[in-house]
A protein has these predicted regions:
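Short, acidic (Asp/Glu-rich) active-site segment that either coordinates a divalent metal cofactor
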Residues: 91-155
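Glycine-rich beta-alpha junction loops
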Residues: 84-86, 107-113, 120-123, 163, ...
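Glycine-rich phosphate/pyrophosphate-binding loop regions near the starts of catalytic domains
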Residues: 1-109
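Short loop/turn motifs at secondary-structure junctions
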Residues: 23-25, 118, 188
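Glycine-rich, flexible loop/turn motifs
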Residues: 1-3, 29, 58, 65-68, ...
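Glycine-/charge-enriched secondary-structure boundary and capping motifs
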Residues: 42-60, 73-76, 139-144, 148-158, ...
Length: 246
């Protein structure tokens, strides 16, 4: 699609959301872009996307580099690194998890930068166009679609909807719990998982000997239902690949 309005947001989100999982407050970000040839217009779009993401995450865009590498890279490659901090001894590691602890899920905004190999295979099989109106109703109470086209919402816009940045709700929760004014003690925030590659199986990484059971899952986003149906992907594989709305 060559639509880069959301990729900077995805890049920052993947970094800061990972920091949150150990209880760290993100404070700064640097980016690196490698391209086969200079494209000022594309660079400007990505730069604006990175700046918007840092604004949402309340962090400083501390610097970055763009390298033109003909013969080494054939497509644009964007990467980044975020820096965060937490008080010594306040890291959240999951080692204190116990049987009976409660899982609280936060809604996702879409696919969240993972599972696109399977998405591309399903798209090829379905024959649907990314630039045409979405073949399903994308409305969902827990998210908005960030538009980069006018008119009907396209399938491409839904599948590229930027990753949600969770800094505001989680840092506020962590700070309140540390200050003794939150809904629980900081020691009761025992683990956090960023549902990325591997889907909900990421929860298994939180503890070596504990499993989990979600008896009241968040509503599944409509694009996941469409992908499962058009790709004949079973429920287990969908949950091992995608966040499914959480």
């Amino acid at each position: 699609l060559r639509k880069y309005q959301g990729v900077g947001i995805d890049c920052v989100a993947m970094n800061v959301n990972d920091l949150l999982c150990v209880g760290a407050e993100p404070i700064a970000f640097v980016d690196y872009i490698a391209v086969p040839k200079t494209d000022p217009a594309t660079h400007a779009i990505i730069g604006a996307s990175l700046a918007e993401a840092c604004k949402r995450a309340k962090i400083t865009l501390a610097g970055g580099e763009t390298a033109t590498l003909p013969g080494i890279v054939t497509e644009l490659d964007l990467s980044g690194t975020a820096l965060g901090w937490f008080p010594k001894g306040d890291e959240i590691t999951g080692e204190n998890l116990e049987a009976g602890d409660v899982i609280i899920g936060l809604p996702s905004s879409g696919i969240h930068s993972n599972g696109y190999t399977l998405v591309r295979a399903i798209l090829e099989r379905s024959g649907c166009s990314l630039i045409e109106k979405a073949p399903f109703n994308p409305e969902h109470p827990h998210r908005n679609i960030e538009r980069f086209e006018e008119g009907d919402i396209t399938l491409g816009e839904i599948l590229l909807n930027p990753t949600r940045i969770y800094v505001d709700p989680l840092i506020n929760l962590i700070k309140d719990c540390r200050d003794g004014i939150g809904p629980c003690k900081i020691s009761d925030l025992r683990a956090m998982a960023h549902i990325t590659g591997g889907g909900l199986s990421n929860l298994l990484r939180l503890h070596d000997s504990l499993g989990w059971h979600i008896d009241s899952p968040l509503p599944i986003l409509p694009e996941f239902l469409w992908l499962a149906n058009n790709g004949s992907v079973n429920d287990r594989e969908m949950h091992r690949t995608f966040n499914m709305g959480m």
